[in-house]
């Protein structure tokens, strides 16, 4: 087979990394049951971290980052998958310790591979990617705990981020009233277009004085940032409400007491998209292809780039300069 292209991150000096598009062969890929011709990948915050010397993502260099990929099977030793099958690969060790999706071909264990559900294209799957998948997991967790639109307002922290944007849009699509919080100035129109009914500042979810129990404001909440905002949401969620958490950009420490749990019956639901069990993973993708699908939003939130554009886009991502989703076309 002829050579194909992939984006490599390398580290020659302890505090310095470099990005370069190189040509490699299939034999250069790691072991796995399924070989896939990648059509699309995406950009997540974790992908940006993987390019940094101090990002604490990549341990061995040179390495191909990219935690998302969607494409078509070209070879499989697992009978569950055959040549020509459209598939999705996200999470697990892809783009972390296993060559990732910024490559025209990947080879992965079959247990990482999810069949593309009916109603979704490969392009659409990567517009969602890990960010959309995590948001969908969060919304589904609320629903599993009985959340319904008539319950009242649902708060979303970090709403202009990848997960927060999708969470806002999916909740709105399902009929929930969304209060979106963001630290980025001038994003009110963007959040309103996603479906937010109310937009508040980051500071609104980070009061100087944090009370163990504050005035009940939200029926439920999706926290994407951790730290103080999560503590605040626990103290302001109404009796019996649920709060999901999936990020820590605002801090990994949580300041709370038992009061929200034993006096208001609050449910704190952890969301882990990396090692989500396979049956649940398929269920979430089914929802993304059906009732969670955002047909009217997918194109306007998406900027399509090529492998050649990736280095600049990844740097922009780390600096917080990306709004919406960057889709990487590899076909």
Please provide the spans of the model-predicted regions:
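Glycine-rich phosphate-binding loop and adjacent beta-alpha segment
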Residues: 228-294, 330
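Adenosine-nucleotide cofactor-binding segment
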Residues: 172-228
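Surface-exposed amphipathic alpha-helices with a cationic face
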Residues: 165-173
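C-terminal hydrophobic helical "lid"/dimerization subdomain
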Residues: 2, 282-331
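NAD(P)H dinucleotide-binding glycine-rich loop of Rossmann-like/cofactor-binding domains
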Residues: 90-154
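Glycine-rich beta-strand-centered segment in the early N-terminal region that forms part
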Residues: 27-43, 53-94
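Short, glycine/polar-rich helix-capping loops at beta-to-alpha or helix-loop-helix junctions
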Residues: 102, 183-190, 252-258
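Glycine-rich NAD(P) Rossmann-fold beta1-alpha1 loop
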Residues: 132-133, 158-165, 226
